């Protein structure tokens, strides 16, 4: 089984052409311990989740924050930061991705998305 996590790749948008500078992309991987906090934010239990000290030099960060009309995912390091709005209609797929990764991890075999959502609600709920 192994450990399944979610990885985010970010890159600057080119001014023309609607393309991205993937050759200078920033890659950040959520740890298994961080993923429930992201699910709590996606569920609306918490307003945001921010994690720092990622990468070899500990300069990378990622934040998921609820905002009017959906969420925003902000990634960065000491050289750049990228902000990507995620509309409400798309947030469902992000939540599904996190639930599937958590269900597939070695601590989650046999757990359904409902089980994971219930666990997150208990841990992060009010």
Residue ranges and their predicted role:
Residues 1-15:
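N-terminal "first-domain core" detector
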Residues 5-8, 49-75:
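Intrinsic, low-complexity N-terminal interaction/targeting segments
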Residues 6-8, 35-38, 94:
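Short, structured motif recognition centered on aromatic/hydrophobic residues
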Residues 12-28, 77-84:
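A cross-kingdom feature marking solvent-exposed beta-strand/loop segments within repeated
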Residues 16-19, 25-48:
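Compact, well-ordered interaction domains used in eukaryotic information-processing assemblies
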Residues 79-126:
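Mixed-charge, glycine-accented linear interaction segment located at domain edges/termini
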């Amino acid at each position: 089984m192994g450990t399944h996590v979610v990885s985010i790749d970010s890159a600057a948008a080119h001014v023309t052409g609607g393309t991205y500078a993937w050759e200078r992309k920033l890659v950040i991987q959520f740890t298994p311990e961080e993923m429930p906090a992201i699910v709590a934010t996606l569920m609306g239990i918490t307003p945001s989740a921010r994690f720092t000290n990622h990468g070899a030099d500990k300069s990378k960060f990622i934040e998921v924050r609820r905002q009017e009309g959906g969420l925003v995912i902000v990634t960065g390091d000491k050289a750049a930061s990228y902000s990507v709005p995620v509309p409400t209609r798309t947030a469902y797929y992000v939540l599904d991705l996190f639930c599937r990764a958590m269900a597939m991890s070695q601590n989650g075999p046999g757990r359904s998305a409902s089980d994971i959502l219930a666990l997150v609600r208990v841990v992060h709920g009010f």
